[in-house]
Amino acid sequence: DHGFGKGRSGDVETLQRIGTKLGFGVDVVPPYDVDGEHVSSSRIRRLLEAGSIEEATHALGRPYSIRGRVAKGDGRGRQLGMPTANLELDDPHKLLPLPGIYAVTVGPVKGVMHLGPRPTFVGAGPTIEVHLFDFDQDIYHHTITVEVQAWIRGIEKFDTVDGLVAAMYADGRKAREIL
């Protein structure tokens, strides 16, 4: 069911003709089903955009991952008692899951991730911030791969910083329970 190009007018035969002309091969694989449902890139995109991480993981056969370089942020997480690794994506076109709070892993290290806007702070743009549990190493400028394990909650605006901090710690506890 593969289509590409304008109006998805390209098909397998088109790709095979292009391959012959340009010197590459095309292997057609049968459809892939999980639990009786067809797995496609469109289905994976819909699941991620809906925040259905566990279903996406099941369909992919592995956790969805986000890769990026750890950059300096504004230090707000550290000031609030929960330092974060701020990610600059390797691929600016990477499909990201629904904005929210997620339980994640980075290699063997467990953590919690905020992905999206920061409505509690006026003028604060969207970010991808990962707090790693029981981890205190300098990883600035390192590239890390964050495996998204589970959805915790959506983005919320808090009336006070204390309310935000309480939610951050509750999110951390929930992520630890999940992981």
Show where each model-derived region lies.
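Phosphate/ribose-recognition catalytic cores of enzymes acting on nucleotide-derived substrates
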Residues: G73-L179
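N-terminal Rossmann-like or analogous alpha/beta NTP/dinucleotide-binding catalytic cores
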Residues: D1-L22
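Short, histidine-centered active-site or binding-site loop motifs used for metal coordination
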Residues: D1-H2, P30, A150-I152
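Glycine-rich, Lys/Arg-enriched anion-binding loops that position phosphate/diphosphate groups
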Residues: R17-G116
